[in-house]
């Protein structure tokens, strides 16, 4: 018995070590088969915002932002750490800014995604340390077609890759040391919008690789996934005979695409090396963002050539197994098609940069089971009451969103310019959604067989039966909200507000708010809460409705 107790205690001790060693966040497949972010043991969706590039460069400026940011109802902030500040001299590391970020976020109940501005940011190398920039022999540059150096660090330079990876590993090791128990930092992004603004790197090292065999890892990936390859990659490969060996020119032809594919492979393997160095010690989820192709006719180099644009996602998937998510930065109007491109079976949807448009957030969380929506320059949005209230509504619905994430029991609603209505089947009901304004958006969750939670603004929902022998009706419509997961009704809607229970009218939530005297300015944070005591304005934002239905 004594031996048994000793054995149990030993394995309990080992289990304790295992639990402590576990990272606070991870990606899993939920029961719906959808990717889900788990934070501190619970499903988590990032209602996020990304800071401007320089906002976290001093503690003073950063500290002025926390209180204003809280008014936007965020739960996560994406913030940069620059290599030039973290390792100002080689081998000397400054933890001031990462400490400030973690402590500030923790005090304000926020999670963090850390963006590593290392070798590249927006295709340039301006965030590399001075000691890297000045040593052009050790850390050589990309060469243009004329053989001249440009300021961008070459992805073919092993010295740069190892120096970058070392610094990032030290940063992540420190995050593990100070934050593992609390789990404030939940995701990492190595580099930012990588790629070069030309067709290829003409450095000696690059030209040597271009003449070598295409890595078998890519060939085998293409063979295995041939039926699902992006058309841009598949068509070039097949037009050149779908060869399974040979140089980049042999396999993909002597053209702009072969140059782009090999450039992409190099960037992806470089960043995978950086990511792997960190994951080895603290395997937080890793995502890589990209500057999108702006026009269909744009060739590589018009946009940063080498980044994970949709055309070359398959190359990234083959080359960078330590990168969990390829993430689009979306400022283009074709939002629905872009997110559909990036939401794949092997790639959950995560949007680290976009515009401050709440409709986008409702769409990606409702329609695509997204992990994150994050407007860029989030501090500029302080005072945007509609956006803040939209995030509040999403937060109220979070238990239901995470419960049904990725299933057919949740959909997004967002009107596009050419759309007049949408019809969708949910369980035994056929829902016809019509729009009352251009800015119509929200989500619909079938929480029970005959109960729907509808959140949104400026649209109507008609409930019909999928069985032609039956008719669908609305039983009741309650307007209200959720506090800590508990429903609190504000009104029972009927009569004019539902056309006598013929339709759900998502008019929105009306809030009377004091008129703001001053716009937010980071240098005058005390002014954000200065209001006129006698002036009020009505603000409309998404509302929440519980709809019970029946068939007869």
Give residue spans per PLM region.
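Polysaccharide-binding and catalytic clefts of secreted carbohydrate-active enzymes
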Residues: 138-313
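N-terminal carbohydrate-binding accessory modules
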Residues: 21-74
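Bacterial Sec-dependent N-terminal signal peptides
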Residues: 1-22
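Catalytic-core region of carbohydrate-active enzymes that cleave or remodel glycosidic bonds
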Residues: 110, 273-284, 311-404
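Aromatic- and carboxylate-lined catalytic core of secreted/periplasmic carbohydrate-active enzymes
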Residues: 22, 363-499
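Aromatic-lined substrate-binding rim segments of carbohydrate-active enzymes
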Residues: 61-138, 267-281
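C-terminal beta-sandwich/jelly-roll accessory domains of carbohydrate-active enzymes
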Residues: 453-552
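The substrate-binding groove and active-site-proximal loops of carbohydrate-active enzymes
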Residues: 46-57, 80-98, 145-166, 178, ...
